[in-house]
């Protein structure tokens, strides 16, 4: 092999190999409302923590690592939807979140492999990962329903925008008793849940399903304009009739929406 060609092969970033493997994957088109859409998408919420050793590197090494990290995000964004968020100073165990949205689990696998084989990847821990699938809710059958003498829209159109400055997320699991209740009884309680949520129109909810895939049954994520309004919404939901049937709903993460460039400037 020619020496120049050999040098080019040797200097090709290993992460680029995984990006090339991801090239056949179609970039997902998000439905207007995931709670009603029949299209199944893969959601993977990956939380990362930068190791202390990163800060012992020379400035030049860190700058090169930051450029490579951005290259990975922008390259894979052709095949996945990648939403970055900062948790810096908001959660002691994490520094940032990458919300990956893919049509196939292989997209998540290849992105993770690329990041692990990058320079920055040597200095990242991933303390939390939540894998879910989207699917239509079994409790949404009609566009409207009467509840307590009031016309209630079961779930308003909640378009994915990614523009809200605040993002909240937690996994949760229902009790065994919940699944033994008659369907109509469960549905009535969920309609009350929806009615309370609808009183906070700037708080958008995305519930996805991890049953059979991960340790929890669901992951619920919220986009919000104001953390005070989100907190008020959660406090009201604590009073709902379905609340006693929640077995666990921690850990909870508070995240701030950031562009890739903003995230890199903050955490690296």
What are these regions (language model features)?
Residues 1-7:
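Short, Lys/Arg-enriched N-terminal segments with co-localized hydrophobic residues
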Residues 3, 187, 236-238:
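Short, solvent-exposed amphipathic alpha-helical segments in soluble enzyme
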Residues 9-77, 103-111, 130-199, 211, ...:
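Short S/T/G/P-rich N-terminal loop/turn motif that feeds into the first structured element of a domain
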Residues 72-94, 121-136, 194-219, 233, ...:
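Short, glycine- and small/hydrophobic-rich beta-strand elements in well-ordered beta-sheets
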Residues 89-90, 107, 120-122, 159-161:
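Short, charge-rich binding segments
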Residues 107-111, 117, 121-128:
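Short, solvent-exposed secondary-structure capping/transition elements
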Residues 110-118, 232-239:
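Short amphipathic alpha-helices in soluble, non-transmembrane regions
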């Amino acid at each position: 092999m020619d020496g120049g060609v050999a040098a080019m092969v040797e200097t090709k970033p290993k992460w680029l190999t995984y990006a090339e493997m991801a090239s056949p994957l179609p970039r997902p088109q998000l439905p207007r409302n995931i709670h009603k859409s029949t299209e199944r998408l893969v959601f993977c919420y990956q939380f990362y923590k930068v190791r202390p050793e990163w800060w012992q590197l020379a400035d030049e090494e860190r700058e090169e690592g930051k450029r490579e990290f951005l290259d990975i995000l922008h390259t894979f964004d052709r095949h996945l939807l990648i939403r970055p968020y900062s948790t810096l100073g908001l959660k002691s165990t994490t520094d940032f979140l990458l919300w990956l949205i893919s049509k196939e689990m292989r997209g998540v696998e290849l992105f993770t492999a690329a990041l692990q084989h990058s320079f920055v990847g040597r200095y990242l821990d991933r303390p939390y990962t939540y894998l879910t699938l989207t699917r239509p809710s079994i409790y949404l059958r009609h566009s409207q329903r009467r509840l307590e003498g009031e016309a209630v829209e079961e779930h308003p159109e909640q378009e994915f925008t990614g523009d809200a400055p605040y993002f909240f997320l937690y996994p949760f699991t229902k009790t065994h008793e919940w699944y033994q209740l008659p369907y109509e009884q469960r549905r009535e309680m969920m309609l009350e849940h929806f009615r309370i949520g609808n009183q906070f129109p700037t708080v958008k909810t995305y519930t996805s399903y991890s049953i059979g895939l991960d340790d929890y049954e669901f992951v619920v994520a919220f986009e919000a304009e104001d953390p005070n309004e989100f907190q008020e919404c959660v406090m009201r939901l604590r009073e709902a009739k379905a609340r006693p049937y929640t077995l666990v709903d921690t850990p909870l993460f508070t995240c701030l929406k950031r562009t890739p460039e903003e995230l890199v400037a903050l955490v690296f």
